[in-house]
Amino acid sequence: MSFSDNLAKIVDKYENLGKKLSSGIMGDEFVKASKEYAELEEVVEKIKEYNKAKSELEEANNFKLEVGLDNATLEMIEDEIHTLENSLPKLERAVKIALLPKDEADSKSAIIEVRAGSGGEEAALFAAILFNMYQRYAELKGWHFEILAIVDTGIGGYKEASASIKGKDVFSKLKCESGVHRVQRIPETESHGRIHTSAATVAVLPEVEDVDIKLEDKDLRIDTYRSSGAGGQHVNTTNSAVRITHIPTGITVALQDEKSQHKNKAKALKILRARIYEEERRKKEQKRANNRRGQVGSGDRSERIRTYNFPQGRVSDHRINLTLYKIDEVVKNGQLDEFVDALIADDEAKKLAEI
């Protein structure tokens, strides 16, 4: 089947679904048809744009062959042909991108977890910088940023921190942030001006609802204990801290931020669902991709993905060899779009090359 035939088949399916929805179907059949119709809507819109440009190019070429056209008209037609010939490859690429298999998690909100890695207190300070950077980015995008938990060091650093980021397509934008982030800078306590290197790990998980991941009570072990502060001292006289273990997978989440055990449990369950869902999603993706390497957003947390060099004022993403000399704009103001957009474009190009 040719590319054009395949596109015509998709448009036919979309139009038939529209007729089906207008015919008065109900229940599960309506829900299924509505979902399919919505999934095809964007694709069909791009197909129609592509077909329109193709049709206009054919008409312009035919018109050019007509006898008796004056020079001004010929020049106008040739300009139109040139414009359409330039736009067609872009429109075709847009159609192919729309036809790529979708990650079902892309439209979801996200949970982001930042943990200090190697580098002691410097790593904890860097983890706090990264966490604040993502908060700024969320604000720029108009997303809702809710802190779930912070384990601080007492002097400005974070051992670990997590947040829920709600909005449209949040996960599709942030999933490429998963991995090891490295920082090179001169600590304030460094008297000889030596550059220290430390790291923090970022994990981005799709936020899921109860309907996506059902947790059975029999599969959960819930432990409660007294919460402690940065120095290890107990800061609460009641067992408000919660540790939940999902027995089948061994995944564990511990929360002690809230004074209420109930609130800590609710937050811990939210993170637990996200981690279980992400584990299942990753296994499916691995199987579907047939061990494809180098995938942007694969979530490989052992992969060093980006370096923040403060003395040089640069941020370098090692996956796409992109370096920006605007560290303050990126880190302090959360201006991540240049990296995010470039990573998404690179991922799309790799997937298109496999078609």
Curated annotation (Swiss-Prot):
Cellular component terms per the entry's GO annotation: cytoplasm
Annotated PROSITE patterns: RF_PROK_I
UniProt modified residues of type N5-methylglutamine: 233
Spell out the post-translational modification annotation for this entry: Methylated by PrmC. Methylation increases the termination efficiency of RF1.
According to the UniProt entry, its GO molecular function terms are: translation release factor activity, codon specific
Q: Which UniProt keywords apply?
A: Cytoplasm, Methylation, Protein biosynthesis
Q: Record's PANTHER family? A: LD18447P (PTHR43804:SF7)
Q: What protein name does the entry list? A: Peptide chain release factor 1
